[in-house]
């Protein structure tokens, strides 16, 4: 009886322990699922929001690889077997290229690796990654054409392209109040109130959400205005009035966009991130709210760039600013060398493209710079954005080397040389001279501390010897 009782007690204790262990595993699994996108170690816990997720995995979140493959196969079979091929070579070439791109996009959306973002759906960001690959291949193709063939190839996309742009008058009368115009003295100001004003505001609002730092946004905004001043002898549309540069652009449009962006960042960093499955919410109002929040981030990471903390972070931040400015300049130079008017839909599509890939690229760059333990290589979208920016610049260099090599005015060159020298001087002082000086002082203080400790030990030994001698005499 005693042995059987002992066995029962042991079996009951084992079952209870197994139950507790399974419960703990379940809690850990839910916790890991909820923190799938936000957990990056203890070092980033202060900048990362806490996420609670009930782990619901519905039809919306599944891969659907077989479904996409079936639809794609049926579509290709329909075109092959039931549709008669037209005898138009140009039309067939366009349709074949578009079909090839669509097949690649279907493969990428279902099979490519997920990025750091999961809202509104991971497939959305995989789609834009594949679009960036297609765009880079298109740029490489344009790069390997002659200047004439490349410009005429744009007619293949839109017959209205491939024509030299008409010359326009920029700058002109810069008086805010024109007393010579009796009917409307403020006509110069009203002329600037066009569609580019909300475009500037919206652009910098989105850039602030990408960069998530007020200082970096302001530096990029101000530096681009300096670049416009410096390069207005190359591109006429850079020639603007002083108040258009500093009041309309920097203060009003860019500044207000950055301000609204920072307020949105504050809200995103403070809001709770609690996710429930749609069918687990009892009320219709809660369901509608959940659908709306599907278009907000799954979790939030506050970017702390800290450029002065180390040489690596300083060079990374300088590189980010440089690539940002180069991408901004490419917008204007590509329009100029490929003969695309500013209002063309391809220009707008390029901006929409960078809006969607820029945020992912910035997050991947920040993770690579800030968290090498979990991110040992640069992210795929950041790699593609860097390659696209460089390729666009190479197209500009090849298609119009004369314009881009026009020498800067002497006073502009002096200003840029002075600025570069100041930045290099500060870099050498901050990360070399200052660090060496601080290290030397620290070593010197350590040596002094050791000498003082050795002296105190020696004095203690001498005093102890004297005490022992006194005791011996007594």
From Swiss-Prot:
* Bilayer topology term: Multi-pass membrane protein
Q: Where is the composition biased (Basic and acidic residues)?
A: 448-468
Cytoplasmic face of the membrane: 84-96, 148-313, 357-376, 425-474
Stretches the record annotates as Disordered: 448-474
- InterPro entries tied to this protein: PSS (IPR004277)
Annotated signal sequence is none
Q: Which keywords, in A-to-Z order, does the entry hold?
A: Endoplasmic reticulum, Lipid biosynthesis, Lipid metabolism, Membrane, Phospholipid biosynthesis, Phospholipid metabolism, Transferase, Transmembrane, Transmembrane helix
Chief subcellular location equals endoplasmic reticulum
Q: Mind telling me which residue stretches traverse the membrane in this protein?
A: 63-83, 97-117, 127-147, 314-334, 336-356, 377-397, 404-424
> What are the annotated GO cellular component locations?
endoplasmic reticulum membrane
Q: Which domain of life is it from?
A: Eukaryota
Pathway listed for it is:
Phospholipid metabolism; phosphatidylserine biosynthesis
Which GO biological-process labels does this protein carry?
phosphatidylserine biosynthetic process
Q: Which residues lie on this side of the membrane: Lumenal?
A: 1-62, 118-126, 335, 398-403
Where would you find this protein in the cell?
Answer: Endoplasmic reticulum membrane
Query: Which GO terms label this protein's molecular function in UniProt?
Result: L-serine-phosphatidylethanolamine phosphatidyltransferase activity
EC numbers on record: 2.7.8.29
Q: Which reaction does it catalyse?
A: a 1,2-diacyl-sn-glycero-3-phosphoethanolamine + L-serine = a 1,2-diacyl-sn-glycero-3-phospho-L-serine + ethanolamine; 1-hexadecanoyl-2-(9Z-octadecenoyl)-sn-glycero-3-phosphoethanolamine + L-serine = 1-hexadecanoyl-2-(9Z-octadecenoyl)-sn-glycero-3-phospho-L-serine + ethanolamine; 1-hexadecanoyl-2-(4Z,7Z,10Z,13Z,16Z,19Z-docosahexaenoyl)-sn-glycero-3-phosphoethanolamine + L-serine = 1-hexadecanoyl-2-(4Z,7Z,10Z,13Z,16Z,19Z-docosahexaenoyl)-sn-glycero-3-phosphoserine + ethanolamine; 1-octadecanoyl-2-(5Z,8Z,11Z,14Z)-eicosatetraenoyl-sn-glycero-3-phosphoethanolamine + L-serine = 1-octadecanoyl-2-(5Z,8Z,11Z,14Z)-eicosatetraenoyl-sn-glycero-3-phosphoserine + ethanolamine
Family stated for the protein in its record: Belongs to the phosphatidyl serine synthase family.
State the protein's purpose.
Catalyzes a base-exchange reaction in which the polar head group of phosphatidylethanolamine (PE) or phosphatidylcholine (PC) is replaced by L-serine. Catalyzes the conversion of phosphatatidylethanolamine and does not act on phosphatidylcholine. Can utilize both phosphatidylethanolamine (PE) plasmalogen and diacyl PE as substrate and the latter is six times better utilized, indicating the importance of an ester linkage at the sn-1 position.
Q: Per its record, how is this protein called by name?
A: Phosphatidylserine synthase 2
Native source organism of the sequence: Xenopus tropicalis
Q: Which gene encodes it?
A: ptdss2
